[in-house]
């Protein structure tokens, strides 16, 4: 018969051990809370970025993503080209997720071996010359050209279809950015309204109207016209969705084109370096749902 343990005679009665276990539990709890707090702080800094400074945000389907003005400018180029080509939303999502994984949406002039640009395409693999690949318009179209040659790409999981195009050493990583791709495509394609905002410093240059016209016609394939005084630019869109696509595209490119405000219908985004720029508000004047008006920075008289 095994020896019986009287109360207080077993290992649990050892006060030293009890204290050690208690300290261990306390350490684990404190460590866990610290880890959670650290993670939450990093997420708050990454996603909220409310410490000031320039930032752009897009929100759709309950998710919000934050990027620098440069990154959001490139995202707008990608989605805009996809729309201009008449491609489905899935194509934009795939392209955005791929560019986030490959370059973090930056048009970088370096990479693994001879990889370059938004999609880290390689001249040695026939993607084009270095100069061509470093042109976001060219590199995005090259990506879409390869994508549409894949039968059934719209129904494929993103890891498979992106790998077919990119031949990456880490194909599973593309899936990490699918939610970001969906949010940016939904916003920039106009499916989600009043959901693209940018907090920006005051413009340091004036709007080059010819560049703005070329940007819209080349990417979104829409046209507009400046006012006589050069202080605004108007686009009459064929539908409300296209109007929101154009409007939020212009917000995403406000830094590039020195745009100080965008109005779509009865809502408006106004450029500023504070929290007011992180939301759309009521416009000063009523507008038709399909009219987009961008306020420009004119040249000095």
Task: Enumerate the language-model features and the residues they cover.
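N-terminal export signals and maturation junctions of secreted/periplasmic proteins
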Residues: 2-80, 193-194
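Non-catalytic terminal regions of proteins
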Residues: 3, 206-301
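Solvent-exposed, acidic/flexible segments
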Residues: 67-71, 75, 87-91, 111, ...
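Short, functionally critical alpha-helical segments immediately adjacent to catalytic or ligand/cofactor-binding
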Residues: 79, 89-104, 165-166
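N-terminal carbohydrate-binding/catalytic regions of secreted carbohydrate-active enzymes
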Residues: 82-84, 109
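Catalytic and binding regions of secreted/periplasmic enzymes and modules that target cell-wall glycans
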Residues: 140-208, 227-234, 263-269, 292-301
